[in-house]
Regions:
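Bacterial N-terminal signal peptides
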Residues: 5-15
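Bacterial Sec-dependent signal peptides at the C-terminal "C-region" and cleavage site
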Residues: 14-22
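Extracellular secreted precursors and ectodomains with disulfide-bonded cysteine-rich loops/domains
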Residues: 21-23, 79, 127
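Short boundary/loop segments of OB/S1/cold-shock single-stranded nucleic-acid-binding domains
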Residues: 21-38
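Structural detector for short beta-strands of small beta-barrel domains
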Residues: 37-61
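OB-fold (S1/OB) nucleic-acid-binding surfaces
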Residues: 52-76
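Netrin-like (NTR/C345C) domain of secreted extracellular proteins
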Residues: 81-203
Length: 203
């Protein structure tokens, strides 16, 4: 009888592992290939996280209607093809291409685990099947931006200005311009920026 609690715990763990089965999806492409098919592209900071959701404070809307309030983004739980919530800690900044949740799905909400859900209608979801998010530090972004290897979230690249990414989303520059910027020599670019700053001071 002493083994019974241990057996129950083992069965519970196995059931949990089954419930967390990995999703199956094909790689949809880098950010430049997938962002146009989403509802909202924003530069935002994570202000809170709970269960499989995070709350974002939008700092800049690259495409779509500018949210009037903070927005909630639903991430991985069960076999949903979304990234793990732990990837987006409070205080971190991101560029995200998001899909709005416009309908309820069967089994998407369990009242016994209200913080683990498919998501509420009107909120947003983030796909893991492509370059749907980019890491942002200040005014610079990195990630699977353009012509990057499949499933590689932080490929070797030179950080690209957020303004340039915004111009791409707005159709003002080409993907080739982003690719060129991501391959620039960081030292040469820093020298160019310093030179421009010096010339402005002289004027």
């Amino acid at each position: 009888m002493r083994c019974l609690p241990l057996l129950c715990a083992l069965l519970w763990l196995l059931a949990g592992a089954s419930a967390r089965a990995d999703c199956e999806c094909l790689w949809q492409g880098s950010f430049t290939e997938v962002q146009a098919g989403t509802d909202l592209v924003v530069s935002a900071a994570v202000i809170a996280g709970k269960g499989n959701s995070i709350d974002l404070r939008v700092e800049h809307t690259l495409r779509g209607p500018t949210p009037e309030h903070d927005i909630r983004v639903w991430l991985k739980t069960g076999d949903y093809c979304r990234p793990e919530p732990q990837l987006f800690p409070a205080g971190s900044q991101w560029v995200m291409a998001l899909q709005q949740i416009d309908e309820e799905v069967e089994g998407g909400f369990n009242p016994h685990t209200p913080n683990l859900s498919y998501g509420r209608v009107g909120d947003y979801s983030l796909s893991s099947c492509g370059g749907y998010w980019l890491s942002q530090h200040g005014n610079w972004v990195t990630g699977n931006l353009v012509e990057a290897p499949r499933w590689v979230r932080e490929p070797k690249m030179t950080p690209v200005l957020l303004d340039l990414v915004a111009d791409y989303v707005a159709g003002k520059v080409s993907a080739q311009a982003l690719l060129q910027a991501s391959r620039e020599d960081p030292a040469a670019r820093e020298l160019l920026l310093d030179t421009r700053a010096f010339l402005r001071e002289q004027n």
